[in-house]
């Protein structure tokens, strides 16, 4: 385990699938005093970040309700998922369809939950207390297995569409949906309902504000404007320009053509930035647990006639010690120093890698007649490269 070996750790979503795994990661992170980061890229999408900036400035008033989802027809992807030879996949379903067949609940909650949890200051003044989940029967799921195996599917645990309702300690409500079965456009919902306005990302990125809330947003004044209709394009553009998130300004445009419209790059750049500058991460191990535990808690609810289930307090009582969700930033001088050191390190690493032919030596191990000798040659080159790199950095 990386944490047990002294390494800060980032885990792909969903990072934990049950309460035992959630608590195990928390206990280990606390024991080692190391970061455990959930790689939830949807928290860094442009609309979510801009809406977060608006929410933090009170544009929507008090956020009282939020919605998120992972609605994504996987029709074209089921057979592309890994087939684990040790998973007893006798029906050749590949891991993801097999997991849906064997497990009930929201199995992929964090894309929808993460961004709205930040807007609601979860673990920074509020926490989830109660959950109720409900699902449809697996109409599509059973037919899908029958189509792939040629046999009647008698047991399919996960419903085609799962809905989870959660209430917070401060009286807010969040609704999260999961559907990877039925044919419909991709949708993460992302809706914020506030006392002064409303934000909705799908099917089109929209905002609706009360006439009072419109004042001071920078949006052009329109007579008789109210929240019965969405803002027009001119107003929306002006609002988004004013609340264009600093992280999008710093990283977004550079990463625009990278993974998932740039949000992967922003997430990774932000993780590195926080580690380089010794800052709290945007998402910690407690967020990871809170967002991932829906899988098992939802199952408990649905397996007991959709009964209410109590959330564990993963923070051990510290959920209201920090006031409001915020991104941490280093002073400009420290930030510049850290960036310069990182660039120097990267340049030195690239130089010694080329000087000592490390990539070629590494690749040669796979095709070598004597792999042990090739590995030994590579290891010796790495030692020399590390010494040369240390010397180069010491001269900076």
Give, region by region, the residue ranges found by the protein language model:
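C-terminal helical cap and adjacent loop that interface with cofactors, partners, or active-site loops
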Residues: 117, 185-193, 200-203, 210-396
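Active-site beta-strand termini and strand-to-loop segments that position acidic
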Residues: 164-170, 194
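Short glycine/serine/proline-enriched coil/turn segments at secondary-structure junctions
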Residues: 74-76, 182-185
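Predominantly a Rossmann-like dinucleotide-binding segment in NAD(P)-dependent oxidoreductases
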Residues: 35, 42-156, 271, 305
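A short catalytic or substrate-binding loop motif that flags glycine-/basic-rich loops and adjacent residues
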Residues: 110-111, 155-160, 168-169, 183-184
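Short, well-ordered coil/turn segments that N-cap beta-strands
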Residues: 7, 34-35, 62-64, 172-174
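Beta-strand-loop-alpha-helix segment that lines the small-molecule cofactor/substrate pocket
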Residues: 1-44, 58
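Aromatic/hydrophobic pocket-lining residues that form π-stacking "cages" and hydrophobic walls in ligand
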Residues: 25, 51, 297
């Amino acid at each position: 385990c990386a944490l047990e070996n002294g390494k800060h750790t980032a885990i792909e979503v969903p990072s934990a699938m049950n309460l035992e795994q959630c608590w195990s990661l928390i206990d280990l992170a606390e024991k080692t005093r190391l970061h455990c980061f959930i790689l939830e890229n949807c928290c860094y999408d442009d609309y979510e970040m801009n809406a977060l900036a608006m929410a933090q400035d009170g544009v929507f008033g008090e956020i009282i309700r939020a919605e998120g989802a992972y609605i994504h027809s996987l029709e074209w992807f089921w057979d592309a998922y890994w087939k684990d030879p040790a998973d007893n996949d006798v029906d050749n379903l590949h891991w993801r369809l097999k997991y849906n067949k064997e497990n009930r609940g929201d199995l992929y909650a964090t894309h929808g939950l993460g961004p709205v949890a930040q807007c609601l200051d979860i673990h920074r003044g509020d926490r989830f207390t109660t959950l109720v989940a409900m699902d449809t029967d697996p109409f599509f799921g059973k037919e899908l297995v029958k189509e792939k195996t040629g046999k009647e599917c008698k047991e399919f645990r996960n419903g085609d569409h799962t809905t989870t309702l959660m209430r917070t300690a401060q009286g807010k409500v969040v609704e999260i949906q999961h559907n990877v079965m039925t044919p419909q456009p991709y949708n993460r919902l992302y809706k914020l309902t506030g006392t002064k306005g409303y934000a909705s990302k799908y099917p089109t990125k929209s905002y609706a504000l009360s006439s009072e809330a419109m004042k001071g947003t920078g949006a052009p004044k329109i007579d008789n404007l109210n929240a019965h209709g969405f803002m027009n394009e001119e107003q929306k553009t002006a609002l988004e320009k004013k609340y264009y998130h600093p992280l999008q300004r710093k990283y977004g445009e550079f990463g625009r053509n990278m993974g998932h419209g740039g949000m992967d790059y922003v997430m990774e750049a932000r993780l590195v930035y926080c580690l380089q500058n010794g800052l709290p991460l945007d998402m910690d191990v407690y967020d990871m647990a809170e967002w991932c535990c829906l899988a098992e808690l939802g199952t408990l609810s649905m397996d007991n006639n959709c009964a209410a289930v109590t959330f564990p307090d993963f923070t051990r009582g510290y959920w209201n010690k920090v006031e409001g969700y915020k991104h941490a930033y280093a002073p400009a001088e420290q930030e510049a120093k850290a960036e310069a050191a990182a660039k120097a390190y990267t340049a030195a690493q690239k130089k010694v890698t080329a000087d000592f032919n490390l990539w070629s030596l590494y690749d040669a191990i796979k095709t070598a007649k004597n792999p042990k000798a090739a590995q030994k040659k590579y290891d010796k080159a790495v030692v020399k490269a590390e010494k040369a790199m240390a010397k180069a950095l010491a001269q900076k």
